[in-house]
């Protein structure tokens, strides 16, 4: 019976994706598909994200040198991609050895390089290092780092190559030298390698009764402050958690505003509504990953008069918190700690994500209308379960099948973790 229910929901999902008129979100321009990003080259000595390489917000801590005789040597896999040139100065094949995550990102980057510059290939000058040529605790010793150039060694391309590496999903990219770009990834077992899109449990939302509640305490029947399709504040039904994890420590981005000083804390792959500094028109706002927001952009803050106001982002930094929660409302938006955010993550297209959850909204509307008391009690029992909701897992897997990998945030979703 459960299988039939899932088939029905998948059918409804497919139907919802072609009914574009069902999309809603703050602002009239909100439903427009985002144009392809313009690649902004990295500057010399710039690194992304703007934190130290071996912090949890980047590639994470050093876990120990791997040698050919160590138990962990089996973690390394050779990369024989014909579209990548390996310098291999040592003639040992060591530069081809890397972790699976590093291999996946490198192969993705190789495709981007050929698309960007026809006839040019990606070139790896350093991969796994077994000879001790790097500084102490270098991620090269674990097969988690590569130094790269283009095959034509055209230094004018290296800034753009750095940006392509960021887009390919490397966890830390550094325009380190005039001679190469340094890229690294998280360890395979890192709990931060897949962070999904969540808020810390202590984040506050506003309720229709005038009170506030921590995100972790939301229950069916709650109406929380959100925004409608015209960018007006409304109280929207809380429907479900797409992810509910009380235990895992994760890295969160903190987006802090200037005058008034407010801050919202969310994971890298979560969507936040932003405006460029040149406009205050709410209809021009778009949804961007938290990790892509920059100081000088604007976010939407609820002012003292109860209206949305665009406020400049002053600084961005990272914090670690235990517990993460991803609430979904009927409008697909939510005001958290006085700042407007999307309920969605992983894919940088709020309208598409909102369409994908149309079957969930339909189920909520019908069930709550026909069986209000039973629906709330049954939903309460379901919501207390830890982990990623099965429907979110389904959407994520469908997204990886149907969408270009560059559309999905590299920190995506850990569908097997809580």
Swiss-Prot record:
PROSITE patterns: INTEIN_N_TER. Residues 1-23 form the signal peptide. Its EC number is 3.1.-.-. A lipid is attached at residue 197 (Cholesterol glycine ester). Glycans are attached at residues 277, 380. It comes from the Eukaryota. The record marks 197-198 as: Cleavage. GO terms for biological process: animal organ development; cell development; cell fate specification; cell-cell signaling; intein-mediated protein splicing; neuron differentiation; oligodendrocyte differentiation; pattern specification process. GO terms for molecular function: calcium ion binding; cholesterol-protein transferase activity; patched binding; peptidase activity. A motif (Cardin-Weintraub) lies at residues 32-38. Keywords: Autocatalytic cleavage, Calcium, Cell membrane, Developmental protein, Endoplasmic reticulum, Glycoprotein, Golgi apparatus, Hydrolase, Lipoprotein, Membrane, Metal-binding, Palmitate, Protease, Signal, Transferase, Zinc. PANTHER family: HEDGEHOG, SONIC HEDGEHOG PROTEIN. Interacts with HHATL/GUP1 which negatively regulates HHAT-mediated palmitoylation of the SHH N-terminus. Interacts with BOC and CDON. Interacts with HHIP. Interacts with DISP1 via its cholesterol anchor. Interacts with SCUBE2. Belongs to the hedgehog family. This is Sonic hedgehog protein. The gene is shha.
């Amino acid at each position: 019976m459960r299988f039939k229910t899932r088939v029905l929901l998948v059918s409804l999902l497919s139907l919802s994706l072609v009914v574009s008129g069902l999309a809603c979100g703050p602002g009239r321009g909100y439903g427009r598909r985002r144009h392809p990003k313009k690649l902004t080259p990295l500057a010399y000595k710039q690194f992304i994200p703007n934190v130290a390489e071996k912090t949890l917000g980047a590639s994470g801590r050093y876990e120990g040198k791997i040698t050919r005789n160590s138990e962990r040597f089996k973690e390394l896999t050779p990369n024989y991609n014909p579209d990548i040139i390996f310098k291999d100065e040592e003639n040992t094949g060591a530069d081809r050895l890397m972790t699976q995550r590093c291999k996946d990102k490198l192969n993705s980057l190789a495709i981007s390089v050929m698309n960007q510059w026809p006839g040019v290939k990606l070139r790896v000058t350093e991969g796994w290092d077994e000879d001790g040529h790097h500084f102490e605790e270098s991620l090269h010793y674990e097969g988690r780092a590569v130094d790269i150039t283009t095959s034509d060694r055209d230094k004018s391309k290296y800034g753009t190559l750095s940006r392509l590496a960021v887009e390919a999903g490397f966890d830390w990219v550094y325009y380190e030298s005039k001679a190469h770009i340094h890229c690294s990834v998280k360890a395979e077992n890192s709990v931060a390698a897949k962070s999904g899109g969540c808020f810390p449990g202590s984040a506050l939302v506003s309720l229709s009764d005038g009170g506030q509640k921590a995100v972790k305490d939301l229950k069916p029947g709650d109406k929380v402050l959100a925004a409608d399709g015209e960018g007006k504040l409304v109280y929207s039904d809380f429907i479900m958690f797409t992810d509910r994890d009380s235990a895992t420590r994760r890295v969160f981005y903190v987006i802090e505003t200037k005058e008034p000083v407010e801050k919202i804390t969310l994971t890298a792959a979560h969507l936040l509504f932003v405006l460029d500094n040149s406009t205050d028109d709410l209809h021009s706002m778009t949804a961007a990953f938290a990790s892509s927001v920059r100081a000088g952009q604007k976010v939407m803050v609820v002012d003292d008069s109860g209206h949305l106001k665009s406020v400049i982002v002053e600084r961005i930094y990272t914090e670690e918190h235990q517990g993460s929660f991803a609430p979904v409302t009927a409008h697909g938006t939510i005001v958290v700690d006085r700042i407007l955010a999307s309920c969605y993550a992983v894919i940088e297209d709020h309208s598409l994500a909102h369409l994908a959850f149309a079957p969930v909204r339909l189920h909520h509307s019908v069930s709550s209308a026909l069986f209000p008391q039973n629906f709330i009690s049954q939903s309460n029992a379901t919501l207390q379960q830890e982990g990623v909701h099965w429907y979110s897992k389904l959407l994520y897997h469908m997204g990886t099948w149907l969408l270009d990998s560059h559309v999905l945030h590299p920190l995506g979703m850990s569908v097997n973790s809580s």
